[in-house]
Amino acid sequence: MPLYVRELGVTDPGRIALWSGLIAAATPAVSGVLGPVFGRLADRFGRKLMLIRSLAGFVVIIAIMGLVTSVEQLFVARLVQGLFAGFTPMAMAVASVSAPRDKVPVAIGIVQSAQLLSVAVGPAAGGYVASHHGIRAAFFVTAALCAVALVGLIALFREVSPTGVAVPRGSAAPLRMRQALRYPNFLLVLALLLIGQFIDRGLALLIPLHVAHMPGLEAVAATSGAIISIAAVAATVSSNLAARLARGIPIPKLLMIGLLAGGPLCAAMALAHGWPTLLVLRTLVGLCFGGAITLAYALGAEIVPGEHRGAAFGWLALGVQVGTATSPLAMGALAAVSIPLAYVFDGVIALVGAALLAFFWGRPRAELRDARS
């Protein structure tokens, strides 16, 4: 996105960072507000319908992004894209209700791994297309891939309920936020998803900016894409491994280990002066944080009954979208001042997540009220 902003006429590095943050935040900001609404509609009328809505919107809006002529138009297109977002939490909800209870983390891990693999392949493929055919062509290719996914979804997917029968429309009562918050540790899971996504999206913005500031490096797009892709592969491995370990090791313990190890490594990226060092550190961070979203959603699946997971995962996705929206804004503002400072901030956020997990997980509500008073 920073490279496209520059192509659209923004040349000042500080303004590139700021616009990149605003554009990256636009879609999740809208999606975060509407995600719970679509989650409740999915529980009531079927998750397949919501998945179709999301992909169909992506096909049109992403193609339009390849046609914009100003950074303001791109920002508006990203806002409109938020009206069709919510694909990932719906896919997570489908996976959580389709798998046996003891295999829910593995099912969620598979969905998350597919998403991470798209992050791995996307920047490298997008960098190649952008280098040889222009950045606009990358948007058209992405829209075409979404169209293929839409056809496959319509033709091949049959939605089932947790009992294994077809989902009757209009069968589920809506789950409101105040009801979701009554589930033990629901708010903590929401916070962990926010933190995990905040860190991931922040690094996705910082890597291209960091590489662009490295002296003597010309292939900025290709190098940035390679670093992001390799880190995403590491995160995919971590997600799969964490999902399988969760069948024998408590999920909060796995999350704690990842956050405590990944925080200092994230801050250490501030010391990277060349792309090889940045690549190694980003890969290690991916190994530590790759399973965070998977494990947090698996915790959510343990907390919420299957018939309400569409709405519940919509509310949990609010944490993801808030993290996705606020991270580019915060990281863009910090990077405009100091890129190393932004890395350190991400590392501190990871340690805050570990502290929240250590203090709040499993504590009775009465004990928490006593601790606050």
Kindly give the residue locations of the regions a language model identified.
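Short amphipathic helix-loop junctions that connect adjacent transmembrane helices
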Residues: 1-17, 205-222
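Pair of pore-lining "gating" transmembrane helices in MFS-fold secondary transporters
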Residues: 1-3, 7, 183-200, 283
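Residue-level signature of mid-helix packing/kink "hotspots" within the transmembrane helices
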Residues: 28-36, 86, 119-120, 232-240, ...
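Conserved MFS/SLC helix-loop-helix module at the cytosolic interface between two early adjacent transmembrane helices
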Residues: 32-69, 246-249
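Structural signature of the two symmetry-related core transmembrane helices
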Residues: 49-64, 143, 253-267
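Cytoplasmic helix-loop-helix junction between adjacent transmembrane helices
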Residues: 77-116, 299
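Symmetry-related core transmembrane helices of the 12-TM Major Facilitator Superfamily/SLC fold
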Residues: 137-155, 342-359
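Juxtamembrane intracellular "pre-TM" segments in multi-pass secondary transporters
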Residues: 158-189, 373
